[in-house]
């Protein structure tokens, strides 16, 4: 197999030279400040070897990638009862669409679109006060990444609170259908803040390692979830992790993954590696343009697609 570090560095160099970088998100004003030329890539293999290139130690707003971890946390709290509140099917619609909620009586299609993640956040909140719920989410991320310095970018959270009218509409619609239990402003406050967690590619790849190794971090030995649950989270990431671009990502990359409008992608090569990439420019579906291309290059070079070489 090609040397992992060399492959990662070659891909990063190619991405740095590409003129087609996508468009930085502007609907959350604070995200519009991101450097469109930034690019980072980290791969952590089963032995704990880290291959990093580019801006791999620059923190960025993980946004919807946090939904992987809130789903994991909520499943640990309520188990499969969670699936009564949220589905497991791709949406085929933009991540902040309200149309399907109207047709499907307030039940979100999956936990990775905004409505679904708000419903999952509400389940976590039901056991806590808002500050406690947010603290539990943040501590879980710090535990997984083995890094207590991970924090919430308060400027991003405030920016989302000021402009999150569509998310408020989603939450209120679900509240009207009995899907949301807590006060809408509490649920949205926790949701906006966990989406505003800032991490580096290195921290994010470390946090995702349990999904690549049957629910266990192979370096620490910590069992985060049972193997069956890890497989199922990966399955939802594969089919729903990139909004209405999920099919394209599966077709081109062939790995479970979750994107965020901050330009990050967490990808999982089962049994092999956890991967994090960051490039702020987005495609039409709200996914990192160069991030997806870089992951496609990586899986082709290493033969890591779950569908075969």
UniProtKB/Swiss-Prot annotation:
Organism listed in the record: Methylobacterium nodulans (strain LMG 21967 / CNCM I-2342 / ORS 2060)
GO MF annotation: an example: glutaminase activity
Residues that bind substrate: 64, 114, 160, 167, 191, 243, 261
Key words, A-Z: Hydrolase
Family: Belongs to the glutaminase family.
Signal peptide interval: none
An annotated GO BP: glutamate biosynthetic process
NCBIfam families assigned: Gln_ase, PRK00971.1-2
Pfam families according to UniProt: Glutaminase
Subunit structure: Homotetramer.
Enzyme class, broadest EC rank: hydrolase
Catalytic activity: L-glutamine + H2O = L-glutamate + NH4(+)
Protein name: Glutaminase
EC number: 3.5.1.2
Protein encoded by which gene: glsA
